[in-house]
Regions:
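Accessory alpha/beta interaction modules
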Residues: 1-12, 28, 65, 70, ...
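Anionic group-transfer/hydrolysis microenvironments
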Residues: 31, 45, 69
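Short regulatory "switch" loops immediately downstream of catalytic or recognition motifs
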Residues: 45-53, 94-105, 130-133
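Hydrophobic/aromatic beta-strand patches that form the interior of the parallel beta-sheet core
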Residues: 66, 89, 125-127
Length: 181
């Protein structure tokens, strides 16, 4: 697959398998701080209220941001990696994960984030595409090439701890609403 095809594939996999369940609300291409020098766009943003039966349940909801990255070059392109949620994930392929894993272990990725994306949260994890019948550990050793003729799932290979959010709930919900979907 080309880079564009991989990005489209991962985005569809995310929306089909992770977003939109009962009580979950999401939007794509969410613009944050538009018309300012700090304008950013998040590939996908999800809001999950604690419950939908009370005001406090809604107010206790959390935002999860997802950035789709097709390869290591895409990760370091300077585009994306805009993390404004309590939880944030890079959604990628196993090949890309294997390519960036040494950078995570050495601290290179954290340094890159501090330098190039200082407004982004430091709370992030990684999800990779894995065949439905497979396990992430098996795929790490022998990745299956991406193809549309196979059933896939997203598996968390680097969990994200829940962190703090620097944008208000009202602002992020408005940004999601403005994006349309």
């Amino acid at each position: 697959m080309t880079r564009a095809e991989t990005t489209k594939f991962l985005g569809k996999l995310l929306t089909d398998t992770r977003l939109g369940g009962a009580g979950s609300h999401w939007a794509s291409e969410v613009s944050v701080d538009p018309w300012t020098p700090k304008a950013r766009r998040v590939d996908y943003m999800e809001f999950s209220p604690a419950n939908q039966c009370s005001v406090s349940g809604i107010e206790k909801g959390i935002f999860t941001c997802y950035e789709i990255k097709s390869c290591k070059e895409d990760v370091y392109s300077g585009n994306g990696l805009n993390f404004f949620g309590e939880k944030n994930y890079i959604v990628t392929t196993m090949e890309c994960y294997k390519d960036i894993l040494p950078d995570f272990r050495s601290g290179k990725f954290a340094n890159y984030m501090r330098e190039k994306h200082p407004d982004s949260s430091t709370y992030y994890g990684i999800m990779v595409a894995v065949p439905v019948w497979g396990e992430a550990t098996e795929e790490f050793n022998d990745p299956t090439p991406l193809s549309e003729d196979r059933n896939w799932k997203l598996e968390i290979v680097l969990p994200c701890r829940q962190g703090i959010r620097t944008k208000s709930m009202t602002e992020l919900l408005f940004c999601m609403l403005r994006s349309g979907r």
